[in-house]
Curated annotation (Swiss-Prot):
The gene is fabH. It catalyses: malonyl-[ACP] + acetyl-CoA + H(+) = 3-oxobutanoyl-[ACP] + CO2 + CoA. It comes from Hyphomonas neptunium (strain ATCC 15444). Pathway: Lipid metabolism; fatty acid biosynthesis. This is Beta-ketoacyl-[acyl-carrier-protein] synthase III. Catalyzes the condensation reaction of fatty acid synthesis by the addition to an acyl acceptor of two carbons from malonyl-ACP. Catalyzes the first condensation reaction which initiates fatty acid synthesis and may therefore play a role in governing the total rate of fatty acid production. Possesses both acetoacetyl-ACP synthase and acetyl transacylase activities. Its substrate specificity determines the biosynthesis of branched-chain and/or straight-chain of fatty acids. It is found in: Cytoplasm.
Length: 323
């Protein structure tokens, strides 16, 4: 008998303020048609003044707890994936812990940009399987619009703010191997960090900086690396894409989603796409999309889900789990 983690609930949150493509066209040289054709994005949400990453995370976490039928006091682990923390330190997860009023336990951040949620999920799952923790919140939350150069049309049209969360519970398990959280594949190639980065930092410039990206190169690496991560998970488990009920990818842009689906021969109807409604929310996008497909009733208990992502670093990965 071993230990197995199960997803007990999902939740998400998007700030009230909506920024449309037409509004962006008044700020930079672009159009709604240009943005939609190249990215599939129609709008993005922007955090209000004074609305922190921890606030967004708390909203998403509360909804996940409600869906799980659990109280915050039952949680003994919080792993928060974010690139846009409230402060340099302490970890934003500690603010989430305090605001939620969770029980005694651990709370820390993981930073792997757009693939951060998968790294956070793999970390929480590993710690729980060791018996160190029993009930966890795994959260992705971002105020990414605060590191955007609004004069750079190559990046400012792509990103938005938001948060998503899941509740994980780890229990003694002697059942089927393909139940709950099944496996993860995470990788990083630091030699490509100059292709997608923020040009500022505490120890380098002493400034916050803005997102800089070589879009065409990022696209090519994303399709290649994400496809490789999917293949690694399928090979490890002896599955094929036909066995997967839903692919819930990082919502970067529709061109990348379509490129991966084509390369891996994944039917379009199996791919969950929400990027049109909230743009690229970095670490928040996978739990946002997962919550969407669950609450819409499309994904049902027992469905097999594969999530995949790539972000700056480059860091990428995939996780396989059954609802």
């Amino acid at each position: 008998m071993g230990r197995r983690s199960f997803i007990r609930g999902t939740g998400s949150y998007l700030p009230e303020r909506v920024l449309t493509n037409d509004e962006l066209s008044e700020m930079v040289e672009t159009t709604d048609a240009w943005i939609q054709e190249r990215t599939g994005i129609k709008k993005r949400h922007v955090a209000a003044d004074g609305e922190l990453t921890s606030d967004i995370a708390v909203h998403a976490a509360r909804r996940a707890l409600e869906a799980a039928g659990m109280q915050a006091s039952e949680i003994d682990l919080i792993v928060l994936a974010t690139t846009t923390p409230d402060q340099t330190f302490p970890a934003t997860a500690t603010a989430v812990q305090a605001k939620l009023g969770t029980g005694p336990g651990a709370a820390f951040d993981v930073q792997a940009v757009c693939s951060g949620f998968l790294f956070a999920l793999a970390t929480a799952d590993s710690l729980m399987k060791q018996g160190l923790f029993h009930k966890a919140l795994v959260i992705g939350a971002e105020t990414f619009t605060r590191i955007i150069d609004w004069s750079d049309r190559g990046t400012c049209v792509l990103f938005g703010d938001g948060g998503g969360a899941i509740v994980l519970e780890c229990v003694e398990w002697d059942g089927a191997d393909d139940a709950g959280v099944i496996t993860h594949h995470v990788r990083t190639d630091g030699t490509k960090s100059n292709l997608l980065y923020v040009d500022g930092g505490v120890s380098s410039t002493g400034t916050i900086g803005h997102v800089r990206m070589e879009g065409n190169k990022v696209f090519k690496h994303a399709v290649t690396n994400i496809s490789a991560a999917i293949e690694a998970v399928l090979t490890e488990t002896g599955l094929t894409s036909a066995d997967i009920d839903w692919f819930v990818p990082h919502q970067a842009n529709k061109r990348i989603l379509d490129g991966v689906a084509k390369k891996m021969s994944i039917p379009e109807e199996k791919v969950v796409i929400t990027v049109s409604e909230h743009a690229n929310t970095s670490a928040a996008s996978i739990p946002l999309a997962l919550d969407h497909v669950v609450r819409s009733g499309r994904a049902k208990p027992g469905d097999l889900i594969l999530s995949e992502a790539m972000g700056g670093g480059f860091s990428w990965g995939a996780s396989l789990f059954r609802l």
